[in-house]
Swiss-Prot record:
ATP binds at S9, A10, M11, N12, A13, G14, K15, S16, D87, E88, C89, Q90. One of its GO terms (molecular function) is zinc ion binding. NCBIfam families: PRK04296.1-3, PRK04296.1-5. One of its GO terms (biological process) is thymidine metabolic process. Keywords: Allosteric enzyme, ATP-binding, Cytoplasm, DNA synthesis, Kinase, Metal-binding, Nucleotide-binding, Transferase, Zinc. Homotetramer. The active site is at E88 (proton acceptor). Its EC number is 2.7.1.21. Coiled coil: none annotated. This is Thymidine kinase. One of its GO terms (cellular component) is cytosol. Phosphorylates both thymidine and deoxyuridine.
């Protein structure tokens, strides 16, 4: 039986690398995969999933209006799909998560979703909220804070490198705008108003 998987983490935990490896594993066995990524995130070029270690794959784009079940069913009828993989799945809508569950339940195609659990305010993304609620399997991909603890929070930094937790939920950026940290140092950085000061303090402890 196919299942719906949600692989979640903070930033820079290797989600895209894990997705590309999973896709490769299917293809190596002669199976066909379809990869989706969010239209909104084009840091590495539109229409592809890229990892920080240099791997990449062509990808179909989804936005809030995409009818994923209809798209996948139509393509599956043309040529069998053995696995659907979705990068940046935090940007899915509630309806799209439901449609992906239908891909699993009605078409018997496994769906592997990769994305962030929470935003820079510590709030769940809509896509992540419903994947946490409806997935068959939840898998945390771990990355670490500068202190060595598990990093479960994402700090947003302004142009001067100062952390803040107000404003729009979605501002696309790479390392220059977001940093993964543990909960303790997330709270401390916001209280002090400087991630650098917290890092310096930690080095001297």
């Amino acid at each position: 039986m196919a299942q719906l998987y949600f692989y979640y983490s903070a930033m820079n935990a290797g989600k895209s690398t894990a997705l590309l490896q999973s896709s490769y594993n299917y293809q190596e066995r002669g199976m066909r995969t379809v990869v989706y990524t969010a239209e909104i995130d084009d840091r590495f070029g539109a229409g592809k999933v890229s990892s920080r270690i240099g791997l990449s794959s062509p990808a179909k784009l989804f936005n809030q209006n995409s009818s994923l079940f209809d798209e996948i069913r139509a393509e599956h009828e043309q040529q069998a799909i053995h696995c659907v993989l979705v990068d940046e799945c935090q940007f899915l809508t509630r309806q799209q998560v439901y449609e992906l569950s239908e891909v699993v339940d009605q078409l018997d195609i496994p769906v592997l979703c990769y994305g962030l659990r929470t935003d820079f305010r510590g709030e769940l993304f809509i896509g992540s909220q419903y994947l946490l609620a409806w997935s068959d399997k939840l898998v945390e991909l771990k990355t670490i804070c500068f202190c060595g603890r598990k990093a479960s929070m994402v700090l947003r930094l302004d142009q001067a490198g100062r952390p803040y937790n107000e404003g729009e939920q979605v501002v696309i950026g790479g390392n220059e705008r977001y940093v993964s940290v543990c909960r303790k140092h997330y709270k401390e950085a916001l209280q002090v108003g400087s991630l650098t000061a917290i890092q310096e303090r930690h080095r001297h402890d």
